[in-house]
């Protein structure tokens, strides 16, 4: 499977996920809409389009070379403990999720990083469009961070893109304005990030905002 095929696969899941969660939050809204939805959709889509165009450069010249280096040389810490198999695949997924937990946390604790991440937190009325609202500076820096993780641990293209697909769907889900039964949400949030779980992170109250950093698995918030 080529890089182009895997990248197209990620884009397909991104589009399908966005359409799905947009439909679900339209039909089963949890909170009343404070602004016209088409304005929010247009604004966030414009940000996403701009970011997508600009991000082609760091992805092409930084991220992809790291992934190719790992693939060609089987370079990285995980190759010392496991060959390419299901065990390495699972470990790589968990490492990436832990890495994203710490990246998110760094964005809140470091004043320089917070200047970029604050753009995402300006939107306190979350919907699936909020998952598109990121400063280009944060995306570039996160690409550099991911590249270091990939090279150090020896994460392959397939492992990375699989995680990215699940991450995109998770971010779309837990930013969406979907009404979920409280009991079911409480059970689900013991394992993965849900809209209600992540809503607390988007309040203007700093104490609430400095928690719930997880991207997929909520266990990292409990451990760290």
What does each model-identified segment do?
Residues 13-23, 63-65, 135:
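Hydrophobic core of alpha-helical transmembrane segments in multi-pass integral membrane proteins
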Residues 67-80:
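Membrane-interface helix termini and inter-helical loops of multi-pass transporters
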Residues 49-62, 77-78, 82-224:
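Membrane-embedded catalytic scaffold of the fatty acid hydroxylase/desaturase
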Residues 13, 17-20, 32-34, 100, ...:
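Early transmembrane hairpin module of multi-pass membrane proteins
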Residues 2-3, 19-21, 55, 59:
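Terminal transmembrane helix and immediately flanking juxtamembrane interfaces
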Residues 23-42:
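Membrane-interface helix-loop junction between the first two transmembrane segments
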Residues 1-16:
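Hydrophobic transmembrane alpha-helical segments in integral membrane proteins
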Residues 3-7, 34-39, 78-85, 119-120:
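Helix-boundary and loop/linker segments of multi-pass membrane transporters
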């Amino acid at each position: 499977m080529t890089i182009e095929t895997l990248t197209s696969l990620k884009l397909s899941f991104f589009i399908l996920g966005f359409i799905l969660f947009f439909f679900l939050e339209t039909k089963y809204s949890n909170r009343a809409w404070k602004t016209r939805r088409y304005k929010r959709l247009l604004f966030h889509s414009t940000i996403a389009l701009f970011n997508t165009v600009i991000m082609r450069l760091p992805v092409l010249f930084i991220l992809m070379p790291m992934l190719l280096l790992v693939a060609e040389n089987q370079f990285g810490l995980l190759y010392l403990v496991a060959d390419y198999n299901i065990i390495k695949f699972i470990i790589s997924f968990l490492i990436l999720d832990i890495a994203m937990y710490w990246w998110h946390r760094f964005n809140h604790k470091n004043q320089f990083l917070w200047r970029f991440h604050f753009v995402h937190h300006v939107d306190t009325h979350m919907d699936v469009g909020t998952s598109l609202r990121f400063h280009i500076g944060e995306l570039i820096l996160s690409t550099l961070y991911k590249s270091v993780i990939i090279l150090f641990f020896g994460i392959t293209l397939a492992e990375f893109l699989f995680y990215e697909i699940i991450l995109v769907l998770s971010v779309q889900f837990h930013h969406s304005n979907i009404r979920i039964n409280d009991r079911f949400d409480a059970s689900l949030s013991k394992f993965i990030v849900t809209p209600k779980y992540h809503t607390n992170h988007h309040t203007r109250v700093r104490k609430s905002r400095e928690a719930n950093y997880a991207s997929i698995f909520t266990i990292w918030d409990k451990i760290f």
